[in-house]
């Protein structure tokens, strides 16, 4: 059971949502697939706020074993406490238990025929005439596995893409430093609504409160700051904005991580390789959310891998189908989010308050272009920030 085969059609590195979706779709469509995960348990350690979009859109039933809360929208809260409510449209989804959810996706992939190797580290990959040799330390034993296609789903610090000459490394200004407590005894504004806080309390980022059943994820993401994310988070716990709501809060888990918010990498394919998920920058630069996008791009990568296997064509030209598909659907929205993020990072607390005072208190969807018109009409001094959106 432990031994790896000598060769596969597809080797996926990383068993997060992107990797598991890629391997599932490759196996389901006939490709002989290996999924490699460095942790001894898929789903650990958890490094994110655990919010996901509508799982039904992926053909996944939101099972109670991993769904902790249904989300119907969120509060955007300015430094002065003004709340803007966003509901409906694309705002609904779930907060999940990632330890269970990621394992569920991997089980699904295994049931489709994927071989899974946990506690396995890819030490390097080497290009061959017809694919890659993948060097794997699997439970202490060394293997060299041949494959026609590598799918790099190995996260924000991806080495696999770099081995293949695809530039995936991010600068410190492109990485959001995150810290989060999972806490009990937190009083939320609404148990089906997320809360987002902005301003100097979380430089170039935001603080979130996400309902999670009997607990709440209380976290922060900041960029290029003088203090640690944890220091800002601890200060927030006694902030007047949440006065009386966190007084009795008790942490039951602490998580840290990094989020790539600099936009997608320039190139996600080469001969015999595709890059997906955090490794590819498949994360909203504005929100830092990436699970849904990574899953969707994982589906595309797995499908193209299977198509490539059937066609016996593993060239960059063929695999570019994957890059074409994901860019057609997601590239423009990602670049818009990058533009919005760059604007948001320049705003002072006073300007954030002016924005909150300039827009309706209830929004069914966030159309930034239309909102920019309303904001500038009521607060002309903000034109310098928003003129490129008008």
From Swiss-Prot:
It catalyses: a 2,3-bis-O-phytanyl-sn-glycerol 1-phospholipid + 8 A = a 2,3-bis-O-(geranylgeranyl)-sn-glycerol 1-phospholipid + 8 AH2; 2,3-bis-O-(phytanyl)-sn-glycerol 1-phosphate + 8 A = 2,3-bis-O-(geranylgeranyl)-sn-glycerol 1-phosphate + 8 AH2; CDP-2,3-bis-O-(geranylgeranyl)-sn-glycerol + 8 AH2 = CDP-2,3-bis-O-(phytanyl)-sn-glycerol + 8 A; archaetidylserine + 8 AH2 = 2,3-bis-O-phytanyl-sn-glycero-3-phospho-L-serine + 8 A. The keyword Lipid biosynthesis applies. One of its GO terms (biological process) is membrane lipid biosynthetic process. Its cofactor is FAD. Keywords: FAD, Flavoprotein, Lipid biosynthesis, Lipid metabolism, Oxidoreductase, Phospholipid biosynthesis, Phospholipid metabolism. Its EC number is 1.3.-.-. Gene3D superfamilies: D-Amino Acid Oxidase, subunit A, domain 2, FAD/NAD(P)-binding domain. Pathway: Membrane lipid metabolism; glycerophospholipid metabolism. Binds 1 FAD per subunit. A 2,3-bis-O-(geranylgeranyl)-sn-glycerol 1-phospholipid binds at residue 368. It holds the Pfam family FAD_oxidored. One of its GO terms (cellular component) is membrane. FAD binds at residues 18, 37, 48-49, 51, 98, 122, 278, 290-291. Reduction reaction proceeds via syn addition of hydrogen for double bonds. Is involved in the reduction of 2,3-digeranylgeranylglycerophospholipids (unsaturated archaeols) into 2,3-diphytanylglycerophospholipids (saturated archaeols) in the biosynthesis of archaeal membrane lipids. Catalyzes the formation of archaetidic acid (2,3-di-O-phytanyl-sn-glyceryl phosphate) from 2,3-di-O-geranylgeranylglyceryl phosphate (DGGGP) via the hydrogenation of each double bond of the isoprenoid chains. HAMAP family: DGGGPL_reductase. Belongs to the geranylgeranyl reductase family. DGGGPL reductase subfamily. PANTHER family: DIGERANYLGERANYLGLYCEROPHOSPHOLIPID REDUCTASE, GERANYLGERANYL DIPHOSPHATE REDUCTASE. This is Digeranylgeranylglycerophospholipid reductase.
